[in-house]
């Protein structure tokens, strides 16, 4: 009887430990999520019109719903991380932790087609060269959010002289 109680107690402790540890095992960091959703170093979509359909599924962006828009960056992770060392700009959400690349980068823009309907998500694949903007956080400071891509780099708005007062 004592052995049976010991085994049951051990199993209970094991189950409690697994329940305690399990949520932290399944939690994807923001940096890891950025890499999964946006990084495809050393690859290109130019010869594959089904690139977005394949990658969106492979990278788990069609589970439960079709993600409407996503961008993959075809540069090294180090080159994308280096964007975080540029001068900061304001993100689309108003936060000041966005940074724009100094040069254009090879990207693939994936956009849901009009015929796309979950679970049969369908995407249009467009290969482009654009300046990318990423939000960065953490220590080390790394990309955690893809904020956009533009053809021309952001330019600072020149300051205007103070208005003249009429006397």
Curated annotation (Swiss-Prot):
<feature type="disulfide bond">
    <location>
        <begin position="84"/>
        <end position="136"/>
    </location>
</feature>
<keyword id="KW-0732">Signal</keyword>
<keyword id="KW-0964">Secreted</keyword>
<dbReference type="GO" id="GO:0003676">
    <property type="term" value="F:nucleic acid binding"/>
</dbReference>
<dbReference type="InterPro" id="IPR036816">
    <property type="entry name" value="RNaseA-like_dom_sf"/>
</dbReference>
<feature type="glycosylation site" description="O-linked (GalNAc...) serine">
    <location>
        <position position="159"/>
    </location>
</feature>
<feature type="disulfide bond">
    <location>
        <begin position="91"/>
        <end position="98"/>
    </location>
</feature>
<dbReference type="GO" id="GO:0004519">
    <property type="term" value="F:endonuclease activity"/>
</dbReference>
<feature type="glycosylation site" description="O-linked (GalNAc...) threonine">
    <location>
        <position position="155"/>
    </location>
</feature>
<keyword id="KW-0325">Glycoprotein</keyword>
<feature type="binding site">
    <location>
        <position position="111"/>
    </location>
    <ligand>
        <name>substrate</name>
    </ligand>
</feature>
<dbReference type="GO" id="GO:0004540">
    <property type="term" value="F:RNA nuclease activity"/>
</dbReference>
<keyword id="KW-0378">Hydrolase</keyword>
<dbReference type="GO" id="GO:0005576">
    <property type="term" value="C:extracellular region"/>
</dbReference>
<feature type="active site" description="Proton donor">
    <location>
        <position position="145"/>
    </location>
</feature>
<comment type="similarity">
    <text>Belongs to the pancreatic ribonuclease family.</text>
</comment>
<keyword id="KW-1015">Disulfide bond</keyword>
<feature type="binding site">
    <location>
        <position position="36"/>
    </location>
    <ligand>
        <name>substrate</name>
    </ligand>
</feature>
<dbReference type="GO" id="GO:0050830">
    <property type="term" value="P:defense response to Gram-positive bacterium"/>
</dbReference>
<dbReference type="InterPro" id="IPR001427">
    <property type="entry name" value="RNaseA"/>
</dbReference>
<feature type="disulfide bond">
    <location>
        <begin position="66"/>
        <end position="121"/>
    </location>
</feature>
<feature type="glycosylation site" description="N-linked (GlcNAc...) asparagine">
    <location>
        <position position="88"/>
    </location>
</feature>
<dbReference type="InterPro" id="IPR023412">
    <property type="entry name" value="RNaseA_domain"/>
</dbReference>
<feature type="signal peptide">
    <location>
        <begin position="1"/>
        <end position="26"/>
    </location>
</feature>
<protein>
    <recommendedName>
        <fullName>Brain ribonuclease</fullName>
        <ecNumber>3.1.27.-</ecNumber>
    </recommendedName>
</protein>
<keyword id="KW-0540">Nuclease</keyword>
<keyword id="KW-0255">Endonuclease</keyword>
<feature type="binding site">
    <location>
        <position position="33"/>
    </location>
    <ligand>
        <name>substrate</name>
    </ligand>
</feature>
<dbReference type="Pfam" id="PF00074">
    <property type="entry name" value="RnaseA"/>
</dbReference>
<feature type="active site" description="Proton acceptor">
    <location>
        <position position="38"/>
    </location>
</feature>
<dbReference type="InterPro" id="IPR023411">
    <property type="entry name" value="RNaseA_AS"/>
</dbReference>
<feature type="disulfide bond">
    <location>
        <begin position="52"/>
        <end position="110"/>
    </location>
</feature>
<feature type="binding site">
    <location>
        <position position="92"/>
    </location>
    <ligand>
        <name>substrate</name>
    </ligand>
</feature>
<feature type="binding site">
    <location>
        <begin position="67"/>
        <end position="71"/>
    </location>
    <ligand>
        <name>substrate</name>
    </ligand>
</feature>
């Amino acid at each position: 009887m004592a052995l049976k109680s010991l085994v049951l107690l051990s199993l209970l402790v094991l189950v409690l430990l697994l329940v305690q540890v399990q949520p932290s095992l399944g939690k994807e960091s923001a940096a890891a999520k950025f890499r999964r959703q946006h990084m495809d170093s050393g690859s290109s979509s130019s010869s594959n019109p089904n690139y977005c359909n394949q990658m969106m599924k492979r990278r788990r962006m069609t589970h439960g719903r079709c993600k409407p828009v996503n961008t993959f960056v075809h540069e090294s992770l180090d080159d994308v991380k280096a964007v975080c060392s540029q001068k900061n700009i304001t993100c689309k959400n108003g936060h000041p932790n966005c940074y724009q690349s100094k040069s254009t980068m090879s990207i693939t823009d994936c956009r849901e087609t009009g015929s796309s309907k979950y679970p049969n998500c369908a995407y249009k694949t467009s290969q482009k060269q654009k300046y990318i903007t990423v939000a960065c956080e953490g220590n080390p400071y790394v990309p955690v959010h893809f904020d956009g891509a533009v053809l021309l780099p952001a330019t600072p708005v020149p300051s205007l002289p103070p208005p003249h007062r009429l006397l």
